[in-house]
């Protein structure tokens, strides 16, 4: 069965719920020999791992977490500025694939905060061992095995097992597995490296070297792809929605002027206090949910009564119930009749009435299910939201759709906070390619990046635009709003 009912999803995931993780989760066993926190079906083992791993994700024991994220964000900006800035006045045009750039950013972030060492994707501006392409090929197989669970038995066959990724591989998922293994071994060697990071927290709480080799691989895959997907979708919709961009820039400008935004990168605590920024992030998570895997729960042996379309029905024991993330996040009863539209304003209370507060709360409780719920909630939620808070704010305030530049210049309302660059999608007709394979994978999200205009350049451009209109015989006032 599949449900788009958030109440049922929460009920199945509640701490004392008799529902358990179904065999779908077993397909998430990325290491060929060992399970991980996402693939364990045994509830006791899963609960024990969550207890021991949660402090490492909280940030309280990872003193470098926010600094490391800031460092990688600035690294990404440096790369964009040095390699991808176009100069139309010199007929120099370069394209940047935002889907790859955001993946490089999140992969380097998770490796840095987990191990204290990055893969170097941003350094190389490349995927040197073909990890992303290999993962795109590997994910559909995981989803098929999760649905047709009997197929997982063939993974035990020597011929198939030998073809699976190994830590000795030079490319793809196996190379990531090898990187994780090397970093773990450094913490257990004769001269172990000690650093206040996630890995150290896990070791302190008794995870073995073998367990860590499996868990760190899961950290990398699950912790980077979903966040990158959420980030690029938010940036895409913000950059292609001028009213949204204007309002976000206005909020950030006001906060900066009031000294409520740190430089060079906004603090996570500051970003959480900006209502429209938070609305943009939530709307991005809603409009294109980053995770689409079923996450199927198993009905207890005695069966359970569940509500379907307002009618209570009996589900036999052993039934698998997965979630429909798209249906849940596009439910008009929860998000309004315009739920197919990217409109962050839906998250802002229209008044202080209890009814309005309840409406926003219901939406918020639903969209947070993108991170799971209850005893199955994502441990990395805090890390992911910190990345989104910072990256959407910093890139969003540095972004302006050049498709609409002329209209903005005519109105003479260029925002003064475009500190870094403008972004223009290369194609509005087909802005990117997309595959829904457990995660929502985007490719070819190509943008043109240009330097921002100074105040003097803006004034000159406005004057030049007016002269061009006169030369073209434009009607007076034809561009007035």
Which residues does each predicted region cover?
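Cytochrome P450 heme-thiolate monooxygenase catalytic core
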Residues: 22-30, 64-231, 247, 268
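Cytochrome P450 I-helix active-site segment
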Residues: 70, 92, 130-137, 239-291, ...
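Conserved cytochrome P450 K-helix/beta-meander segment immediately N-terminal to the heme-binding cysteine loop
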Residues: 323-358, 464-465
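Cytochrome P450 heme-binding "Cys pocket" and the immediately downstream C-terminal segment
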Residues: 82, 242-244, 354, 363-364, ...
